[in-house]
Amino acid sequence: MANLKRTYHFIAEFFDVDSMGVMWHGNYVRYMEMARCRFLDEVGFNYLAMKEARFALPIVKLDSKFIAPLEFNQRFCIEVELLEFECFFRLKYTFLDLDGKKLCQAHTSQVAILLESKETCFYLPNDFIKALKAFVDSH
């Protein structure tokens, strides 16, 4: 449906690594969140806009495959690929070093819930879908 890709650059900070000097596995999720926030900012419908529209987008599924370690002070990028945005908001994350070597691959699935009732929606809100479609069409 979508398959739009955007790339965001980062550096592995000292507080991200363990005593062996490699990034602790839990911190990959934090970087995915930062990349997802940048992606949503580009779309023009970020988490603050979702709050104003009275819905949230919790993650209901996350999977990851760690291929090669990230080390302290290593520069890397995350390629975010939009996979679906009808019932689920699905993204694929590919962590790459600056030479293009794959370091990690992950996927998240998110569903919309109404903030007041916490009720799960069967589809993503129309305004969010419209923003995503406009973003895809413009790229």
Question: Where are these predicted regions, by residue range?
Answer:
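Hot-dog-fold acyl-thioester-processing enzymes
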Residues: 2-59, 115-139
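HotDog/MaoC-like acyl-thioester-processing domains
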Residues: 6-8, 71-72, 83-139
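A generic signature of intrinsically disordered, low-complexity regions enriched in glycine/proline
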Residues: 20-22, 67, 101
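Hydrophobic beta-strand-centered segment that forms part of the acyl-chain substrate-binding groove
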Residues: 39-77, 81-89, 103, 111
